[in-house]
Amino acid sequence: MKIGIYTLGCKVNQYETQAMEQELTARGHELVDFESPADAYIINTCSVTAVSDKKSRQMIRRAKKNSPDAVVAACGCYVQTHEKEAKSLGIDLLMGTNDRARFLDRLEEAVKTRETVADIDDALRRRTFEVLPAGGMANRTRAMLKVEDGCVNFCTYCIIPYARGPVRSLPMDKAAEQVRALRAQGY
C-alpha cells in the first residue's frame, strides 16, 4: 500500500511520525510524498494555536481533494481536542494522540473495508506512557527519543494537557534500551 504522511507541529509529532513510518515500512508499505498518488494519507495534526488548527484542516482537505478515493486518516492534537470539528471534515480514520500501533492497524483495516472509524480516548485519563521505537529521521544527523509526554500545569492559555494528558514517562530501562539501539544505528 502507498501511504503519504504530513506532519504539523512539534518535535513530539515529528518523533511519533518517524515511529509510524518505521512501523509502516516494516509492515511492507511504501511511503510516498504527500502530494503523490497514494492509497492512504496520514495527517499528524497540531492544535497549539488557532493557526495550527487551520493548517491541520487545510491539510486534511488537501488530501481529500487531491485523492478522493484514498483513505484519509488524521491523528494528533487537533483531532484529540476538536473531535466534532474533525469529524465534519469527512476523515475516514480519526485517532487522537494515543496508541499509534492500533492507529496503523485501523488504517490498514480502513483501506480494506472503507469504513469510517473515530477512536479518540479521554487524554486526561491516561496513566501509561506509549513506548514507540526510537530511530533517526531520514536526512537527519540526530535521532530523537521521547522520554515524557503530557503536562499537568493547565496554564490558562495552553491546550496541551487536554491534547496529551497528564505527565507520563518512558521507564528508565526502556530509555536505556532505546539509547543503546540508537547508538548501534550510528547516532
Predicted regions and their residues:
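Proteins enriched for Cys/Gly/acidic motifs involved in redox and nucleic-acid/cofactor modification
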Residues: 1-187
